[in-house]
C-alpha cells in the first residue's frame, strides 16, 4: 500500500507559505510509508524532537484497481472512496532541510503523520472493452479486488462532486481553522492520478492525499481535531 501526497495544490496556501500566488509547472508529489497512517480515532502523539508540527487538512481518495499510464479521461475509474485526512508536517525541520537543499521526507513521513478519516464510497466503475490496454486499464488482476466493503456508507453527494467541488474543513477545539473546496485545486484528482501513474503502478488500496488549502498552523498537546467533508464529520481524534 502506497500513500501519495500532493504539495502546493491550492493557490492561497502557496501564497501563505511562499508569499506569492502561483501554480507549479507539474504536480508536486511525495510519499509516506504505511507506518505514517493514523486512523480509527487513535490519538496523535506529538513528537517533541520535531519542533513545531502543523496540521494540513486534505481530501483523500482511495485507489480501487490496478493501473499504469492512465489517461486523464479514464482516471475516475480508479478511485472508489473519499474522506478527509491530515498531512502533519514538522515545519521547522522541513524549512531547515529545504534551505540546505536536502530531501524533506523525515519532516512529512514520520510515524502518525497521515491521519485518515472514515471512508465514504463513490462508484468505482468497471473497465469497458473500449478502454485501450496501454492505458493500464485492466480487470482487477492477480486476485486484486476493490476494497469497498458493505459496511462503508456512501458519499451523499454524487461522485462528480469530487470534480466539481466538495467542501471540507478542520476544527480544532471547536473552532474552524481551515476550510477548502476541491473546486479550488490547481491540479484536479483525475489529473493527479494520470500524472502519478506515469511513474508508479497504482494498486488497490493505495491512497492519494490531494493537498491542503490555506490556514495551516501548529497543533499542541490536548488539541481536539475534527475533520468534515460536505458537513459530515469523518475525522475525530486528540493530540497527546
Question: For each predicted feature, which ranges?
Answer:
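Catalytic-pocket segment enriched in acidic/His residues
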Residues: 9, 13-24, 91-130, 151, ...
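Extended, compositionally biased flexible segments
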Residues: 1-85, 91-96
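Ala/Thr-enriched low-complexity intrinsically disordered regions
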Residues: 139-141, 146-149
Amino acid at each position: 500500500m502506497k500513500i501519495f501526497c500532493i504539495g502546493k495544490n491550492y493557490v492561497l496556501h502557496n501564497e501563505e507559505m511562499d508569499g506569492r500566488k502561483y501554480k507549479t509547472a507539474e504536480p508536486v508529489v511525495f510519499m509516506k510509508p504505511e507506518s505514517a497512517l493514523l486512523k480509527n480515532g487513535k490519538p496523535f502523539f506529538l513528537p517533541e524532537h520535531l519542533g513545531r508540527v502543523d496540521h494540513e487538512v486534505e481530501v483523500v481518495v482511495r485507489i480501487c484497481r490496478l493501473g499504469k499510464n492512465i489517461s486523464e479521461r479514464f482516471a475516475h475509474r480508479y478511485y472508489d472512496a473519499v474522506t478527509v485526512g491530515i498531512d502533519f508536517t514538522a515545519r521547522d525541520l522541513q524549512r531547515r532541510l529545504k534551505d540546505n537543499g536536502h530531501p524533506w521526507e523525515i519532516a512529512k513521513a514520520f510515524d502518525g503523520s497521515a491521519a485518515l478519516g472514515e471512508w465514504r464510497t463513490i462508484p468505482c466503475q468497471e473497465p469497458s472493452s473500449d478502454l485501450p490496454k496501454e492505458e493500464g486499464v485492466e480487470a482487477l488482476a492477480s486476485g486484486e479486488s476493490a476494497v469497498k466493503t458493505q459496511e462503508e456508507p456512501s458519499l451523499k453527494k454524487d461522485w462528480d462532486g469530487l470534480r466539481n467541488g466538495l467542501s471540507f474543513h478542520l476544527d480544532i477545539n471547536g473552532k474552524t481553522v481551515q476550510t477548502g473546496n476541491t473546486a479550488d485545486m490547481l491540479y484536479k484528482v483525475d489529473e493527479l492520478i494520470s500524472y502519478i501513474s506515469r511513474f508508479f503502478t497504482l494498486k488497490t488500496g493505495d491512497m492519494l492525499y490531494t493537498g491542503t488549502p490555506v490556514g495551516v498552523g501548529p497543533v499542541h498537546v490536548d488539541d481536539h481535531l475534527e475533520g468534515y467533508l460536505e458537513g459530515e464529520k469523518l475525522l475525530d481524534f486528540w493530540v497527546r
